[in-house]
């Protein structure tokens, strides 16, 4: 009997062991991108949910890991079948998660999940658990539906959701444009960038979880989100802990930033080492944190080492170490490393080294790394971004790198030159945040036809998909303190994130992000370009040429450059800046690495394009050819707070010629000319701005004093059915009969003299100021002092405040009006 019982126990124990072993085994399912045969994302989720093989996907088991296989040319994984009915079994519409699933990407640049226009992207059902790592999720819309919350992802009651090192963008919902979490089950977001989402409540995130269920929000960037009712950034009716996060540039009719939406005191809402500034309500007023409770019923938990600009109706049970200044000095949103856009901290930011120096309380201490994965110092910078200089250029010489690709900037004499640095970064890839000390960097190495980076212009490119390049050059101080000057026959700078492969314009894109701060580029003289790779290429960009990639130029001047098309040369484009942000066309993959370029606080002046060989020339200042409507995730070319002045084209287009998707806010296009050597009627296109296409938007734009030949010519729309889409408050002195303007034209000032003064310089930035009696002065009400996206523009091109409490209205154009200085010698600056 004992023997029999013992045998039975042994058998049962063995069976339990087998079952336990079976349960512990988890499946790995390889998922292939769109355009590649094999297991697809929706099918893989079904196989994981049901533990049954489905279509081309192997069966799931336990906590399944879905590995999104990297495909360099086709990085998109779409949600697949569009919604046809409201169902929760993952057949159509959103991707329903009913089991424990990990979705693993390569990085946000190379793994892109695209949602539907008529449903969210992910729905984590009760009992389900989703961990989402290293991806970008674009889109998802549930506005107007019966369960209209969570545009990108929804966590239901009884579910858990964890998102790490990812990007959530372009979602639309009633509650939570990107993320909505409700009921029991933990929400954890770490190193996530949430931007360009919209909702009625909680443009970025909405939480309606019961007391005691704390949402863990670490290293978040919540930026550029909009709420139609309230809480552009985060709306919470529940507990959350926000640590080392940045909430900025969000907007709502009600509260711009964060709103705690319950009445009553709570210990469950806590802030540590974070930044909440630069958010605005519908009146354009600062609005960063608001509590819905009445006086005495509006106390939150702790605020430690946290910068909050405008706090309304909130108190805290405990406070410690909070900065006295709210001057965060944030950069525009950009990829400064990791593929997750953040806001860098610029010189003088009150957020630098403002974090908790103690780790005695783990919940109030600095996190060990920032949103990009950069290690934090003991007294960290507050917000999602930790400033860290990777390399300092320590020589003004123009020596090349000795061994590109070894990860070390090393030129002759054991120095790190600007040329060596860009050669090494381009060859090695990865994150490079570079200090560029003030002074003049002369480019004096002649063009080497056998080795492009070795001579001529500075070249930034990454011709590999692995280890994407994110390079930031940070000049010192004013825009003219750090100068890059070419003394040879080439442009000054070329940034290339795209190659052309044939006459069909099939583009090959590489994930590349380049930013330049605080610099003046001059002296470019482009007469030949043996390295042109795009079909039908020309001589493009005397100062800067940008082809593909993601680029940011902030507090930068491009001046005194020239393009000359000499025989047997080709057409010449853009004496100053040439930008090509085309990402795709009919023949290549859907949604590749979207190219976009942003110029903010800039000047393009005194550049020239000529044709001594008799060839066509276009655009003395700026020429941009942008993406079309086939590009789902590109902003094309955008300009904010800039001056394009005194540029000259010997034939066509004086100031700027812009095609495709572009936008311009607070830009002055002044005193440019086209065709000055030709008789009247011979020149084509405007002396000021020539625009083509319908996907363009202009706001608070000033165009005046430009010439085509000898005739006033400020604006022309040059393509059939094209127009400038006005968002209001544009001043054009001489629009003529060929400048079609659509959109909101009610506040535009046409055929009006802005009464500009002569060119001045402040903080190294050239500009033309309107006179004190100019119709451009105070023409914009505070609620419209925005860019084309509807977000408040705080500074002008020189860094001066756009508005003040005494005078909240803004001026049209690049700068707020200033008095013209009088010098004893009688000369203007």
Regions found by a protein language model. Give the residues of each.
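Right-handed parallel beta-helix
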Residues: 127-218, 225-226, 488, 499-632, ...
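Predominantly extracellular beta-rich ligand-binding scaffolds that present long acidic/polar faces
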Residues: 160-162, 181-344, 361, 388, ...
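Short acidic, low-complexity intrinsically disordered linear motifs used
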Residues: 820-829
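Sec-dependent, cleavable N-terminal signal peptides
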Residues: 1-27
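N-terminal, post-signal-peptide segments of secreted/periplasmic proteins
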Residues: 18, 22-149, 155, 266-518, ...
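Ser/Thr-centric signal marking residues that sit
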Residues: 28, 111, 131, 136, ...
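Short helix-terminating capping/connector loops at secondary-structure junctions
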Residues: 56-62, 429-430, 569-571, 615-616, ...
């Amino acid at each position: 009997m004992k023997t029999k019982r013992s045998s039975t126990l042994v058998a049962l124990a063995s069976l339990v062991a087998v079952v336990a072993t079976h349960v512990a085994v988890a499946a790995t399912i390889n998922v292939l991108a769109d355009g590649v045969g094999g297991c697809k994302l929706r099918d893989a989720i079904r196989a994981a949910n049901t533990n049954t093989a489905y279509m081309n996907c192997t069966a799931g088991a336990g906590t399944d890991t879905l590995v999104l296989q990297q495909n360099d040319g086709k990085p998109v994984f779409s949600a697949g079948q569009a919604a046809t009915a409201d169902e929760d079994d993952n057949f159509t519409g959103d991707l329903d998660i009913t089991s424990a699933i990990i979705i693993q990407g390569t990085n946000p640049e190379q793994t892109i999940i695209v949602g539907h226009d008529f449903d969210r992207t992910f729905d984590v059902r009760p009992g389900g658990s989703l961990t989402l790592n290293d991806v970008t999720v674009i889109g998802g819309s549930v506005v107007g539906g019966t369960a209209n919350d969570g545009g990108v992802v929804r966590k239901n009651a009884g579910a858990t959701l964890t998102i790490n090192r990812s990007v959530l963008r372009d979602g639309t919902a009633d509650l939570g444009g990107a993320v909505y979490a409700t009921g029991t089950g933990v929400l954890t977001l770490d190193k996530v960038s949430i931007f360009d989402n919209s909702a009625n409540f909680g443009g970025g995130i909405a939480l309606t979880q019961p007391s005691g269920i704390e949402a863990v929000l670490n290293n978040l960037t919540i930026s550029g989100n909009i709420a139609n009712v309230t809480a552009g950034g985060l709306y919470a009716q529940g507990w959350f802990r926000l640590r080392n996060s940045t909430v900025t540039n969000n907007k709502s009719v009600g509260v711009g930033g964060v709103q705690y939406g319950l009445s009553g005191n709570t210990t469950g809402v806590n802030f540590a080492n974070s930044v909440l500034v630069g958010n605005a309500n519908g009146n354009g007023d600062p609005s960063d944190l608001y509590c819905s409770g009445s006086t005495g019923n509006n106390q939150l938990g702790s605020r430690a080492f946290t910068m909050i600009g405008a706090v309304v109706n909130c108190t805290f049970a405990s406070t410690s170490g909070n900065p006295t200044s709210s001057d965060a000095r944030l950069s525009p949103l950009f990829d400064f490393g990791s593929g997750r856009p953040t806001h860098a901290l610029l010189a003088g930011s009150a957020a630098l080294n403002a974090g908790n120096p103690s780790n005695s309380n783990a919940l109030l201490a600095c996190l060990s790394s920032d949103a990009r994965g950069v290690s934090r110092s003991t007294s960290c910078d507050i917000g999602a971004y930790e400033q860290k200089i990777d390399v300092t250029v320590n020589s003004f010489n123009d020596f090349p790198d000795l061994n590109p690709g070894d990860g070390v900037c090393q030129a002759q004499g054991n120095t790190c030159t600007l040329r060596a640095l860009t050669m090494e970064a381009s060859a090695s890839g990865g994150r490079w945040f570079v200090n560029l000390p003030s002074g003049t960097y002369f480019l004096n190495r002649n063009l080497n036809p056998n080795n492009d980076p070795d001579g001529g212009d500075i070249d930034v490119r990454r011709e590999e998909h692995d280890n994407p390049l994110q390079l930031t050059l940070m000049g010192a101080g004013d825009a003219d303190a750090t100068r890059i000057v070419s003394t040879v026959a080439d442009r000054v700078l070329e940034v290339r994130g795209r190659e052309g492969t044939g006459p069909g314009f099939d583009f090959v894109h590489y994930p590349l992000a380049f930013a330049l701060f605080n610099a003046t580029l001059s002296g470019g003289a482009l007469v030949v370009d043996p390295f042109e790779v795009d079909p039908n290429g020309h001589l493009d960009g005397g100062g800067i040429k940008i082809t593909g990639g993601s680029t940011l130029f902030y507090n930068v001047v491009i001046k005194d450059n020239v393009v000359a098309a000499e025989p047997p040369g080709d057409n010449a484009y853009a004496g100053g800046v040439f930008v090509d942000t085309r990402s795709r066309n009919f023949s290549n993959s859907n949604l590749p690495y979207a190219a976009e370029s942003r110029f903010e606080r800039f000047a393009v002046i005194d550049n020239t394009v000529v044709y001594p060989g008799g060839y066509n020339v276009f655009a003395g200042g700026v020429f941009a050819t942008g993406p079309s409507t086939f590009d789902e995730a590109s902003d094309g070319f955008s300009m904010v707070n800039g001056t394009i002045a005194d540029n000259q084209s010997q034939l066509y287009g004086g100031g700027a010629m812009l095609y495709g998707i572009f936008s311009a806010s607070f830009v002055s296009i002044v005193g440019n000319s086209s065709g000055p050597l030709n008789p009247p009627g011979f020149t084509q296109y405007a002396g000021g701005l020539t625009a083509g296409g319908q996907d363009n938007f202009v706001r608070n734009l000033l165009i005046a004093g430009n010439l085509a030949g000898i005739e006033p010519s400020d604006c022309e729309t040059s393509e059939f059915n094209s127009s400038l889409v006005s968002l209001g408050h544009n001043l054009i002195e001489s629009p003529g009969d060929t400048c079609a303007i659509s959109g909101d034209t009610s506040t535009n000032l046409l055929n009006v003299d802005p009464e500009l003064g002569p060119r001045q310089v402040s903080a190294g930035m050239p500009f033309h100021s309107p006179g004190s009696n100019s119709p451009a002065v105070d023409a914009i009400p505070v609620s419209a002092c925005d860019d084309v996206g509807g977000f408040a523009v705080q500074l002008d091109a020189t860094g001066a405040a756009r508005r003040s409490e005494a005078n909240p209205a803004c001026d049209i154009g690049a700068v707020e009006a200033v008095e013209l200085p009088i010098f004893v010698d009688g000369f203007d600056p």
